[in-house]
Amino acid sequence: MQKKAIRSLLWMQALLCAMFLFACSNDDDNSNAPLPKPDPKEVKVQVAADTKTNTATVNVANAPAEASLSLVLDINRGKALDQATADKNGTHTFKLPLLAGYEQKLKLVVKSGGTSAEVNNLTLPAAEEQYTDEQITQGLQGHVWQSVQTRSRILVGHTGTRPYSQFVTQALKRFEFLADSKFTFTVLSPLQKSFPNGTWTVKSKRIDIDTQIPLGPMQLHNTRIQNLTNKELVMLTEVEDGLFLLTFEAQ
C-alpha cells in the first residue's frame, strides 16, 4: 500500500514537471515571436502642398506607436529627406520645402520592432522657378558666396568614385560668379586651393558651371536657384548623376 502511494506521488511530480516545462516552452516561443509587421494599407498618409509658401505637409496616421518614420526620395540612390518617430498614437506631421523646378517623388518607410513597410506614390509638386535670367545674373555677381555645409545635403547619391559627398557636406568653399562668364572656385578647408579658370552660363533660369577640383574637371549642370537674396544663395544642382542641395552665405 505504501509503495503504491509512493508511485502515485512520483507520477504526480512527473506530471507537474512536464506541465511546467511545457509552459516554459510556450513562454519562450511567445518571447521570440516577431512583432506584427507594419501594414502599409493601414498606415494613412496625406500630402498637402502650399504653392504660396512653397512648403508641404505630410501627415502620417495609424502607424505603430513610436515607429521610426523616414521620408525618402523614391528614385535610385535617393536619400532620406526627413526622419522622425511617431507618437504613441502613431501619428506625425512632416514639413518639407517644395523645390523649384523639381518634383519630389517620395515614399514613407515605417519601421517597428525590426520589421518595416513602405507607403509609395507620394508626390510633392515642383515650386515655380521665380527668378529671371537677369535677376540670377545680377544676384550671383553681387557677392562672393561661401558655403554653409550644415545646410547643404545630398539628395541623390552619385555612382562615380569621386568624393562629391565631401564636396557637399565637408569642404568649406567659395563661388565667385564674375563678368564675361568667368568663374572662380576656391577651397578653404580641409585644404586651400583656388581654381580661377572656370566658366558659368545662365539660360532659361538654369545655370551650368564648368570648374575643377583637385581630382580633375567638375561640372555643375541644370542648376536651379531655390533662393537668392543679398544674404543667401540656395541652389539645386546635378553633378554627374547625383543631385545636391547647396547653401551659401554672402561675404
Residue positions per predicted region:
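C-terminal motif of bacterial Sec signal peptides marking the signal peptidase cleavage site
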Residues: F20-A23
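Bacterial lipoprotein signal-peptidase II cleavage site
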Residues: S25-A33
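A generic structural signal for short, non-catalytic loop/turn and secondary-structure boundary residues
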Residues: A14-C17, Q138-L140
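Bacterial N-terminal signal peptides that target proteins for export
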Residues: Q2-M12
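Lipid interaction determinants
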Residues: P34-N59, P64-S68, D74-G78, D82, ...
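Residue-level signal for mature regions of secreted extracellular proteins and peptides
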Residues: C17-A18, K193
